[in-house]
Structure formats: C-alpha cells, structure tokens
C-alpha cells in the first residue's frame, strides 16, 4: 500500500470540525499555530504553554490535534528501535510516500508528520502530554534545520550564562535542576532537551517550552514542590524503600511560574559550562566535581547525545532512521569552548549544589 500524507490526513481528520479557538506559540523566530476540534484541549494547551502564548495571525507551521477515537488507518507499523538501556515497545512507524505516520504503542495515539501536515489523533485529552511532545517536536525540527544540535540535558541560567546538566539514566538531573531553582538568581531554560549552536564565535543554548515532568521521589524531599501532592500521598510515599521511591514512575508537571514565580523562564542564553552527572546512588566515595576534557572522555558523550527521534524530518523531506549513529565530532565541535565538569561519587544533591556555587556559579 503506497499511501501519501494527504490520504492519511483525510482519515485522521474524518468529519471533525475544528473549533474557532486556536493557540499561537511564539518560540523566538518560530511561530506555531495549534488547532483542534476540542475547545477543552485548546484550553489545557493554553494553560500549559501560557509563558509562550502570543497574539498572532500567521505561523510558520500548524499543528492539528483531533480528539476522539484512534483512527483506523489500515497501516502496518514497524517498531522504532529503543535507545540502549530502554526496554519495552514505545513507538512504531510507517513510511508514507511523502511523510511518516507514528503510532504510540502504549496509548494508541497516531501522529502524522510531513512537510504539509502535522496531525495528532486519538484520545488527546487523556494523553495530552503526547500532544505537547508532538508540538515541541515541530519546534525541535525547526531548530535543527537551522544548525542547532540536540542534547539530552537540562538548562539553567545564572548571571546571564546557561549551565547545561546531563546525566546517565536515573542520574537525577531534573531533581538537581529543581533544587538549584530554589536560588532566585537562577532561571529555568529547559528540562531535558537543550540545543546548542556556535554563533559568531559564541556558543549559545536554547530550550523548548517543555515543563519539568517529574516523579514522586523528586517531590517528597523538596519543600518547594510538596504542595503538588496531598499530605496523605506524601506520607504513603515516604513509607517506601528509598530505591523503590526513586524508581516509581508517576509523572507530574512542574509549572515553573506558579512554583518559583513569574519571569523565571529564559528561552536562550550563551552557554559557558556543562555538568555531566556520573555519580552513583550506591557509591561510597564523596561527591565531587572535576573539570574534564570531553575529547579525551568520549564515554561521557553518551550522557548528553540525543537522537532527534521518529518525528525528525530533514530539510530534504527524508526522515531520521532508528539505526542512525551519533556524530560525536559534531558535539565536540559545538561544545569546544564550553567548560565541561563531571560529577562523581555518591548522589548528594545538597553537596553538589554547594560545589557548583563555589566552582561554576562564581
């Protein structure tokens, strides 16, 4: 079956009527328009993206989200290969003549990615986080088309300079970042997708409007976040073994402006330092940070390199493949003027924050 994006779009849109309400997002020079058949979904997305919502009439791209049953496309999907260390089925895809269809295995959601159509269809209200990720994927594509390199990292801004934070799986970069935000002099840039690019001899960092999405283990020990759950829920969680609590997968969105105050989000800034968390929960060594040469420690690149994923469409219309290898030299080139630090020893957030204040935030 040789389907094209237009024929699949007709199936996904069905007889849905798009509501009058829409949402425009101002992401630097990139403007996105979001439309849906569900006013409730537009309201939810407007609340989530409130810090980048703008009044506009024109957009570089349009994303349509159709709330309803999962459309029956009749397409046969192929599983997208997971990254090392990840298990279970997550994404599947089907190539079209001029686009790609992506199926979220756990939720059933369907997404059409092409140069003309960007459509999400299925129970969008129930799985609005996947719609949010799809919207952010369009911004990520736009950035990468303009030479920005994707990093699996958080980003904070202090004194006008970005600090990137990367870590191996379960390293606690989101927890560390949120603790650092307790300092009013620190601003939020991004949770786990940071983009870097050298401009006129200066290395710049850019984030995407994705709020931190955290597990209960991050909430229970952070007084600033404890209001996100009930006192009863916190008591139940504190009864769990530390390792069980750490591994518990329940997701909560942290609305930065509500928790930390207005004006605490920065979209773009020069980046001068990058911290890679290579510490261990079961280590007996004291927490420490050391400046390292990334070229001589290519093993650390695995913590910060990130595949663009199944939604990435190159400027020539072709798509990212799941067996594409990373270009390590591209990361070394873009980060050559950024000071790289490695955190070692046992996981101790308070100790590491103190070390960062003495070593990096000076």
Residue ranges and their predicted role:
Residues 169-170:
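Walker A (P-loop) phosphate-binding loop of P-loop NTPases
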Residues 180:
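Aromatic pocket-lining residues of Rossmann-like dinucleotide-binding sites
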Residues 1-166, 183-189, 194-362:
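A noncatalytic interaction/capping subdomain that flanks phosphate/NTP-handling catalytic cores
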Residues 173:
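Conserved lysine of the Walker
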């Amino acid at each position: 079956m040789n389907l094209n994006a237009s024929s699949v779009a007709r199936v996904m849109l069905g007889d849905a009527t798009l509501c009058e309400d829409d949402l425009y997002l101002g992401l630097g020079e990139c403007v996105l328009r979001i439309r849906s058949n569900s006013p409730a979904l537009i309201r939810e997305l407007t609340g989530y993206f409130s810090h980048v919502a703008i009044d506009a009439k024109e957009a570089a791209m349009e994303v349509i989200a159709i709330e309803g049953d999962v459309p029956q496309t009749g397409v046969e999907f192929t599983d997208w290969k997971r990254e090392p260390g990840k298990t279970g089925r997550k994404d599947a895809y089907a190539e079209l003549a001029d686009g790609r269809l992506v199926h979220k295995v756990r939720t059933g959601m369907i997404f059409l990615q092409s140069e003309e159509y960007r459509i999400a269809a299925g129970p969008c209200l129930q799985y609005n986080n996947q719609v949010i990720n799809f919207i952010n994927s369009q911004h990520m594509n736009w950035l990468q088309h303009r030479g920005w390199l994707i990093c699996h990292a958080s980003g904070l801004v202090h004194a006008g300079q970005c600090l990137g934070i990367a870590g191996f799986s379960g390293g606690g970069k989101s927890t560390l970042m949120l603790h650092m935000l307790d300092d009013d002099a620190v601003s939020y840039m991004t949770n786990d997708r940071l983009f870097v690019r050298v401009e006129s001899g200066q290395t710049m960092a850019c984030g995407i409007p994705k709020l931190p999405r955290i597990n209960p283990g991050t909430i229970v020990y952070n007084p600033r976040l404890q209001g996100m759950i009930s006192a009863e829920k916190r008591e139940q969680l504190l009864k769990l073994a530390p390792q069980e609590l750490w591994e518990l997968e329940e997701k909560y969105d942290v609305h930065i402006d509500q928790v930390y105050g207005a004006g605490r989000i920065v979209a773009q800034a020069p980046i001068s330092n990058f911290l890679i968390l290579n510490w261990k929960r079961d280590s007996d060594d004291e927490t420490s940070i050391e400046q390292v040469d990334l070229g001589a420690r290519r093993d650390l690149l695995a913590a910060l390199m990130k595949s663009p994923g199944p939604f990435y469409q190159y400027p020539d219309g072709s798509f990212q493949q799941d067996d594409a290898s990373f270009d390590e030299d591209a990361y070394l080139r873009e980060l050559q003027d950024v000071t790289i630090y490695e955190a070692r020893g046992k996981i101790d957030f308070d100790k590491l924050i103190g070390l960062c204040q003495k070593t990096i935030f000076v």
